[in-house]
């Protein structure tokens, strides 16, 4: 009796079981989380502070919209924040974005939560 079909069948079953284990590992990795801490500083000092735990890969702007009252205008380059927690900058002042203590080099919509982030919005004077 030829045992080849039984060996091939056993190998296929083994590979299917092995691929099932790999999927569980990927699913566990997808459940990893990171923390985004949003701090908002206006003319009179701190307006709001909120820490949010979310899955890695979450968009910082989407998290902000869900957890802090924010108004914005959407442009081709991304959202321009106009009001946070009911506070609007006066005159030519603007909302400045700092991420992990440094002035942001990109917009809030371009930050992805792949590690813990400290996100701070401050009203600053325009240099113009």
Regions picked out by a protein language model, each given a short descriptive name:
Residues 2-128:
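Ubiquitin-like/PB1-type beta-grasp interaction modules and other compact soluble beta-rich domains
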